A protein has these predicted regions:
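Nucleotide-sugar donor-binding/catalytic module of glycosyltransferases
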Residues: 1-216, 307
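C-terminal subregions of glycosyltransferases and related glycan-biosynthesis enzymes
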Residues: 150, 177, 189, 193, ...
């Protein structure tokens, strides 16, 4: 569990839900990422009160490293047969870990993930599935899933279970990708991934969620920075550092060409339009939007971003 400036009532709900997990053999590793609004001395009593069924340990980063790096350090430090990653504001159903563990063993998978109920700030359920609030979120199962996973993830960190040895072999994480995206991609390259339609957590959707769709995108400039420049860095890192077979190398090479073409097109090089369209299979919606971007009034562009956030398109 990585913690940063937690809302204490949400944190307690999360911890309470961990404490009643029916899976019998747990150990909780907690790292506070140098919180600025909540002191470690405030967090420790909540942990002590809520976590009584299994051992835990807590440590503190001397400077803010971000959740990706914090989860990387926890992955390096933790011991066990499986790792489950935990947010600070969700609620896990009691059978979450036992169902995921049974599935990963039965299916001989590298990673298993579940769907989730969506709740709001007040804990009220607003959707029975993540797919109801994210139109393009499609769960997949099986082998050979890297063809699209390099670009788009479906396994949320708070809802997955991964074999510990596989997670450790994935280190260091891609510094430009969300940790759950990279772990899922790494596992897909090694073997089978299983997605369960059954929701096993109550995921709290709010404006501060790190991986919320189009978080931080407000205009063309922020769109380019978050949805294009960051993705270019992600796939370049994979292309240069990820060990894989020739088939995946080709996918990463063409994916990098597509991303770099998008980046140059947005910067004014309209000769890249054909290349964007050539590789549109990676994301038809993004390709269409960005080809049209130079001709869209700013108000229309912002309306499209708003509509995408609201799951209308």
């Amino acid at each position: 569990m990585a913690i940063y400036n937690p809302k204490m009532d949400w944190l307690q709900e999360q911890l309470d839900s961990l404490n009643i997990q029916r899976y019998p053999n747990l150990h909780l590793y907690v790292c506070d990422d140098c919180s600025s609004t909540v002191k470690l001395e405030e967090i420790k009593p909540v942990l002590k009160k809520s976590i009584t069924a299994f051992p835990y340990r807590i440590k503190y980063n001397n400077k803010n490293l971000g959740s990706n790096k914090t989860f990387e350090l926890l992955t390096q430090e933790a011991e066990g047969e499986y790792f489950a990653y935990c947010d600070q504001d969700d609620i896990w159903l009691p059978d979450k870990l036992s169902i995921l563990q049974e599935t990963i063993e039965r299916e001989r998978a590298e990673l298993v993930c579940s769907d989730m109920f969506i709740i709001n700030n007040n804990g009220r359920k607003i959707a029975n599935s993540i797919t109801k609030i994210r139109r393009h979120h499609i769960f997949r199962s099986g082998t050979g899933l890297t063809d699209t996973l390099w670009y788009s993830n479906f396994a949320s960190g708070c809802a997955l279970l991964v074999r510990a040895d596989t997670a450790k072999k994935s280190l260091p994480f891609n510094p430009y990708m969300y940790y759950d995206h990279y772990i899922t991609f790494f596992c897909a390259n090694r073997g089978k991934i299983i997605s369960l339609e059954q929701p096993l957590i109550k995921h709290r959707e709010h404006g501060e969620n790190q991986s919320s769709t189009l978080q931080g995108v407000h205009n063309r400039e922020s769109y380019k920075k978050i949805r294009v420049d960051k993705k270019v860095d992600e796939v370049r890192w994979l292309k240069e550092n990820f060990s894989c077979d020739n088939k995946l190398k080709l996918i990463l090479t063409t994916g990098c060409e597509w991303m770099e073409a998008r980046q140059k097109y947005i910067c004014g090089d309209h000769t890249k339009r054909k290349l964007i369209w050539k590789y549109r299979k990676y994301s038809p919606m993004a390709s269409l939007l960005e080809i049209a971007m130079p001709y869209l009034p700013e108000a229309i562009f912002r309306l499209l971003i708003w509509a995408s956030r609201k799951n209308y398109i």
